[in-house]
């Protein structure tokens, strides 16, 4: 009885951890570099649009201040 109990747990422990370790790191490495390229391109387009928005917002701010003065 003591002899068969030892080999059974030893055998499954080795194959289970070895199998998942290999596929996990290989699979994510490939998809990660692919999406990085499109994300960078999109960010470049969004960056120039951001500064355009605050510029028109700045003149709107004083208008709101004038309305407050008129209310007072």
From Swiss-Prot:
The region called Disordered is annotated at: 1-61
- What is this protein's tissue specificity according to the annotation? Developing endosperm.
Q: In which residue ranges is the amino acid composition biased (Pro residues)?
A: 1-36
Q: Is Calcium given among the entry's keywords?
A: no
Keywords of this entry: Seed storage protein, Storage protein
**Role, per record:** Sulfur-poor seed storage protein.
Q: What's the protein here called?
A: C-hordein
What organism, scientifically named, is this protein from?
Hordeum vulgare (Barley)
The uppermost taxa in this organism's lineage are: Eukaryota, Viridiplantae, Streptophyta, Embryophyta, Tracheophyta
């Amino acid at each position: 009885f003591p002899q068969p109990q030892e080999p059974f747990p030893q055998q499954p422990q080795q194959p289970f951890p070895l199998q998942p370790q290999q596929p996990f790191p290989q699979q994510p490495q490939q998809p990660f570099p692919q999406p990085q390229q499109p994300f960078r391109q999109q960010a470049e387009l969004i960056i120039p649009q951001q500064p355009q928005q605050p510029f028109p917002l700045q003149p709107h701010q004083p208008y709101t201040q004038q309305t407050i003065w008129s209310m007072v």
